[in-house]
Amino acid sequence: MKRTFQPSKRKRKNKHGFRERMASANGRKVLARRRAKGRKKLSVSSENRHKH
């Protein structure tokens, strides 16, 4: 049986990245909540610079 987590850096960036969050109203709400909570990392884009 294939496992559910099949990691891919590109998919991770495209689905959960900062630009993707900013693209929708709900995504912006996510970022606002994370800012209010004081998260060091707002999105997965905060990890490192390269899109693999």
UniProtKB/Swiss-Prot annotation:
One of its GO terms (molecular function) is structural constituent of ribosome. Coiled coil: none annotated. Residues 1-52 are annotated as: Disordered. It comes from the Bacteria. Pfam families: Ribosomal_L34. Transmembrane segments: none annotated. Residues 1-16, 30-42 have a biased composition (Basic residues). InterPro entries: Ribosomal_bL34 (IPR000271), Ribosomal_bL34_CS (IPR020939). GO terms for biological process: translation. Keywords: Ribonucleoprotein, Ribosomal protein. GO terms for cellular component: ribonucleoprotein complex; ribosome. Belongs to the bacterial ribosomal protein bL34 family. This is Large ribosomal subunit protein bL34. It comes from Christiangramia forsetii (strain DSM 17595 / CGMCC 1.15422 / KT0803) (Gramella forsetii). The lineage of its organism: Bacteria, Pseudomonadati, Bacteroidota, Flavobacteriia, Flavobacteriales.
